[in-house]
Amino acid sequence: MAEEVSTLMKATVLMRQPGRVQEIVGALRKGGGDRLQVISDFDMTLSRFAYNGKRCPSSYNILDNSKIISEECRKELTALLHHYYPIEIDPHRTVKEKLPHMVEWWTKAHNLLCQQKIQKFQIAQVVRESNAMLREGYKTFFNTLYHNNIPLFIFSAGIGDILEEIIRQMKVFHPNIHIVSNYMDFNEDGFLQGFKGQLIHTYNKNSSACENSGYFQQLEGKTNVILLGDSIGDLTMADGVPGVQNILKIGFLNDKVEERRERYMDSYDIVLEKDETLDVVNGLLQHILCQGVQLEMQGP
């Protein structure tokens, strides 16, 4: 199968169990588009981690680096990042140990942002003026899913308003997209006063964070899943899907590559090391969808 799906021969692809990947891709192909849904993280998964050696901004960074944030606030947010990010990606701490730190980080950051008199109309401008970039091949990815009626569930611990605006400005915000994220709550005068619903951080991206969405229940029959993430916390994103039959987990290994490679290879079926494109995902989709059509035409 690895021979058939030429995209898996790419140098950035790591697989602990190629035979297992072969089986899963075969099952996804058999089910075709009718049975498939895609569940993805956003920051550093659909968006780029780096471009020309320079780090790209996350949905939070876009706001942090913008003109609408005071210098004072920016310094405080940067201090939080320097304190908590090493904890988030520390391979020697368990998720349980990291949890309280993540809640603390997100809560402090949200409180700082709420003091900034951010207005709803400013979001589009902030995104326009940022260095936000989606991964190479994003148009093919979003359009393929849309044209084949494959639901795309974006589960993000970032800022929903920002990432939605990025996708809109890239002209790929199609009706098959559903987003669960930290959405801003503006008061009647249009100023940011808080964030809606339950706080979503790196390590609670599971069914508990979106049980109220009822989203997966509507997708009965979509029992095959492609999951895309860039952190160990992303592995639970499909936990709310009832009756999953086949799931292919693809992980982008962007940072601290040496320290985290083994853990990622143990956790994800396919690991993409320092790969800033969606080539492998697009190649797999093409393979699954083409074969799905052929199988239908051939009959049982």
Curated annotation (Swiss-Prot):
Keywords: Acetylation, Cytoplasm, Hydrolase, Magnesium, Metal-binding, Nucleotide metabolism, Nucleotide-binding. Its main location: cytoplasm. SUPFAM superfamilies: HAD-like. It catalyses: N(7)-methyl-GMP + H2O = N(7)-methylguanosine + phosphate; CMP + H2O = cytidine + phosphate; a ribonucleoside 5'-phosphate + H2O = a ribonucleoside + phosphate. InterPro entries: HAD-like_sf, HAD_sf, Pyrimidine_nucleotidase_eu. The modification N6-acetyllysine is found at K256. NCBIfam families: HAD-SF-IE (TIGR01544). This is 7-methylguanosine phosphate-specific 5'-nucleotidase. It comes from Homo sapiens (Human).
